[in-house]
Design a protein with these regions (language model features):
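Single conserved hydrophobic/aromatic residue that forms the stacking wall/gate
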Residues: 2-13
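Residue-level detector of beta-strand face positions
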Residues: 14, 31, 143-145
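Acidic, low-complexity central loop/insert segments
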Residues: 15-28
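Solvent-exposed strand-loop boundary residues in beta-sheet-rich modules
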Residues: 18-19, 36, 150-152
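A structural microfeature
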Residues: 24-26, 42, 152-156, 162
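Hot-dog-fold acyl-thioester-processing enzymes
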Residues: 25-27, 34-115
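Short beta-strand edge segments in extracellular beta-sheet folds
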Residues: 29-33, 161-163
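Acidic/His-leaning functional-site neighborhoods
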Residues: 76-160
Length: 164
């Protein structure tokens, strides 16, 4: 059984088995991008097109800040490739998780699954930009962030669990 709710500029998904046991949940918040200015646009112009879900109780709270793990840091330099980009010609937010899982490495991901993660997007990553990434791990916890020059573009924090 699935649950889905759209609350303005965000979505919530929950998946349950036939006995009602929760298998997983996910939430997202998003913004409108003015493609001419490459800045966030106020949502007022489309709010009238969105369903009124003000009576729904949010099944997930708002995401908090990502906690940077205090473990040893591993850095890499990345330049986005074509398949990292979406229709808006910037790196798609799902690609940041790909980058993170790749940085954690094949051996780690063969032995572990994501128990939870939070991804915060600060500013878009564009083609040609060199991104410095930092991976920190401490036990089953990790943090991964990307910077263009001195500007943080995104950060991810999470916890791994052993695969069964």
């Amino acid at each position: 059984r699935d649950y889905y709710a759209s609350r303005g500029l965000g979505d919530v998904y929950k998946r349950q088995d036939d006995q009602g046991q929760e298998l997983g949940r996910a939430g997202s918040l998003w913004v409108l991008l003015n493609l001419s200015t490459r800045h966030m646009a106020p949502p007022d112009s489309i709010l009238s097109l969105m369903p009124d879900n003000s009576d729904l109780v949010a099944p997930l709270g708002l995401p908090g800040p990502v906690t940077e793990v205090s473990g040893a840091v591993t850095t890499e330099r990345k330049v986005p490739v074509y398949t990292d980009l979406d229709v808006n010609h910037h790196v798609n937010n799902t690609k940041y998780m790909d980058w993170c899982c790749n940085a954690l490495g094949i051996d780690c991901m063969k032995e572990h699954a994501l128990r939870r993660f939070c991804l915060n997007y600060d500013v878009e990553v564009l083609p040609g930009q060199e991104i410095r990434t930092e991976l920190r791990t401490l036990g089953d916890h990790f943090s991964y962030c990307g910077f263009h020059e001195s500007q943080r573009s995104f950060d991810i924090g999470g916890e791994l669990m052993a695969r069964k």
